[in-house]
């Protein structure tokens, strides 16, 4: 039960946190950017805690692929930019360069682009006053208004760049770009007019070209690319959810780049590239494929905290503690020490890594949100940190804040984490199908020989126990969309796809379904078909809201979690029992909720023990709270 929506210390470091943990660090200076950049990819292949193999998805190309986080490959990428950035490289038969950055959502494609431009190849673009200096235009499709067409947005962005550039907007350069047209007009239809009249008509002509945008941009860019290089960078295409729009951006970008002899750098999801890799538009380019593997999220967060600490050093401030006292801080960077010490190398840090599923952008957002709302006793934290030099903030508060995000109660539609207890199929018998299928695939992944499981196998086995193909398809699509599973080939999930579980899927099936905080959050958005159980949960929730005694309230919360868990176990049991009757392999017969019951009892016992230890005066009689020690 959340009684406080904001962390009392957040305002002291809010600006620095928002900047350092921003989804985009585009506006950081060169030094700060270099401090934030992580060049070490995630290499985990086996998670010992849940004893599951972490599968890897296949490459989208069989040929050579450069690794963006590999030192040798990075140098080769730099060499490519330098070669194409040389003066007067555009000979008649030369194809423009096309670089495709392929990676999963949040893998760091945008960060890699800015790192290359700001740090590794900055000298190529340093002298803007030189006509032969190459050009770099970064177009972010998150800035594209929905009513604007793709082509119009690209052309308007190029025009804005032209207007800002001291050389491209110069009247002499504009005249040179339109020289042939101007001379043709003068000697043709305007030959009878006076010089003043000719200049007036030519001005009208140029202004008309400018208003129409495309012909003006075509002339200016075509002229500059005769003598130097122009790199057009199309970014954040993968943030657009509609595949059709992604596909059109892909083809339109290639078309414009080919027409204007631009070097194209395009960020894409692998799935979008697969759909178009045989497109005729691609044949016009010399291809370089750069694979951006997700960096270690723990390293990313560590560097962001280091940047926050650097920016807050020697700043003073104060906040109102939970007891109403005003706490003054001579150096608010010690708050960063408390927070980072509670995240890095801790269970909280591991949870963020797992829940983000290699999505750095999501990991940064979750960290930012739980720091804003996740803690209720910062005064106590500061006091203990001053006395002992270390303090670990409560992990359950952080975990709840991560699950809830900006909301007060959990809803799958707003949370970054999906609900495994409700498949949303509108059939009570199929309510736990999402968790059942996930547990089966995670069980297979516990075998060292596991590589993948085919969708045809999943469909066949589920048919055996009475699950229709339509339900199977919907669940597989959901599990992939919710990041519990991945398709090996990056394509859409179908019966012909092969699947591997994500690390998040493994933790859901093997740990989180018996976690008290997780259960409490999930039950708020789970359908309860059994009227008796629903009535009990409703009554307990009402009593919890009105109860003021902390231990009584926690005891009732434990009882509510148990009732919910037992109801979910009853719903999944028929699927497991049918698999046993039909003689399916052991992976299909295991009941994850029954198997996790000992861990649930241990978890709830820990919660009750912690409540007594923290909130109950020693002289009180514990029996009056009716604590159920046998859970």
Regions found by a protein language model. Name each.
Residues 1-127:
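Walker A/P-loop-proximal flanking segment of P-loop NTPase domains
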Residues 109, 143-161, 228, 342-381, ...:
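P-loop NTPase catalytic cores that bind/hydrolyze ATP
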Residues 439-631:
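Terminal-proximal interaction/regulatory segments of ATP-powered molecular machines
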Residues 193-221, 325-354:
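Alpha-helix-centered segments that form part of catalytic cores
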Residues 30-34, 45-53, 345-348, 358-453:
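Winged-helix-like regulatory helical subdomains adjacent to P-loop NTPase cores
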Residues 107-108, 143-146, 237-244, 272-273, ...:
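Short acidic, S/G/P-rich loop/turn micro-motifs used as interaction or catalytic elements
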């Amino acid at each position: 039960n959340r009684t406080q929506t904001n962390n009392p210390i957040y305002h002291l470091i809010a600006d620095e946190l928002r900047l350092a943990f921003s989804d985009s660090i585009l506006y950081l200076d060169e030094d700060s950017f270099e401090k934030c950049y992580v060049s070490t990819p995630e290499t985990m292949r086996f998670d010992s805690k849940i004893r599951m193999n972490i599968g890897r998805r296949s490459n989208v190309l069989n040929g050579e692929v450069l690794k963006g986080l590999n030192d040798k490959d990075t140098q080769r990428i730099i060499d490519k930019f330098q070669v194409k950035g040389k003066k007067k490289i555009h000979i008649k038969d030369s194809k423009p360069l096309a670089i495709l950055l392929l990676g999963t959502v949040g893998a760091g494609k945008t960060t890699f682009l800015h790192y290359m431009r700001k740090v590794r190849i900055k000298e190529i673009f340093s002298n803007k006053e030189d006509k032969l200096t190459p050009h770099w235009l970064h177009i972010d499709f998150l800035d594209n208004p929905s009513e604007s067409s793709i082509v119009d947005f690209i052309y308007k962005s190029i025009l804005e760049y032209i207007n800002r550039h001291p050389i491209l907007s110069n009247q002499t350069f504009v005249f040179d770009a339109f020289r042939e047209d101007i001379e043709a007009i003068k000697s043709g239809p305007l030959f009878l007019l006076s010089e003043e009249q000719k200049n007036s008509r030519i001005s009208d002509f140029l202004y008309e070209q400018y208003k129409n945008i495309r012909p003006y941009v075509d002339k200016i860019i075509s002229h500059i690319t005769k003598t130097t290089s122009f790199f057009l960078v199309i970014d954040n295409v993968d943030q657009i959810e509609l595949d059709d729009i992604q596909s059109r951006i892909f083809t339109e970008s290639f078309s414009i780049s080919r027409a204007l002899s631009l070097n194209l750098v395009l960020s894409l999801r692998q799935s979008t590239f697969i759909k178009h890799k045989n497109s005729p538009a691609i044949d016009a380019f010399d291809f370089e494929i750069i694979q951006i593997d997700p960096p270690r999220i723990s390293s990313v967060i560590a560097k962001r905290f280091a940047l926050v600490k650097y920016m807050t050093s020697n700043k003073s401030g104060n906040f109102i503690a939970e007891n109403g006292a005003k706490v003054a801080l001579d150096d608010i960077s010690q708050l960063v020490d408390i927070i980072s010490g509670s995240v890095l190398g801790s269970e909280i840090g591991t949870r963020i890594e797992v829940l983000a599923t290699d999505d750095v952008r999501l990991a940064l957002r979750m960290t930012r949100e739980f720091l804003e709302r996740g803690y209720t006793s910062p005064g106590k934290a500061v006091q203990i940190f001053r006395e002992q030099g270390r303090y670990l903030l409560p992990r359950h508060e952080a975990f709840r804040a991560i699950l809830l995000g900006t909301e007060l109660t959990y809803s799958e539609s707003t949370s970054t984490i999906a609900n495994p207890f409700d498949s949303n199929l509108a059939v009570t018998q199929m309510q736990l199908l999402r968790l059942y299928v996930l547990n089966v695939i995670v069980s297979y992944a516990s075998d060292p020989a596991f590589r993948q499981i085919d969708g045809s196998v999943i469909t066949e086995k589920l048919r055996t126990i009475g699950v229709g193909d339509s339900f199977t398809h919907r669940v597989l699509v959901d599990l992939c969309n919710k990041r519990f599973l991945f398709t090996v080939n990056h394509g859409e999930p179908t019966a012909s796809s092969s699947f591997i579980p994500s690390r998040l899927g493994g933790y859901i099936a093997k740990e989180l379904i018996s976690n008290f905080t997780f259960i409490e959050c999930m039950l708020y958005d789970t359908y309860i078909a059994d009227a008796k159980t629903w009535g009990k949960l409703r009554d307990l929730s009402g009593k919890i809201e009105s109860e003021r005694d902390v231990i009584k309230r926690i005891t009732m919360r434990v009882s509510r979690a148990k009732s919910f868990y037992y109801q979910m176990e009853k719903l999944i049991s028929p699927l497991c029992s049918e698999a046993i009757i039909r003689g399916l392999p052991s992976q299909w017969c295991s009941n994850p909720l029954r198997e996790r019951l000992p861990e649930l009892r241990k978890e709830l016992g820990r919660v009750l023990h912690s409540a007594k230890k923290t909130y109950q005066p020693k002289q009180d009689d514990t029996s009056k709270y009716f604590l159920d020690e046998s859970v």
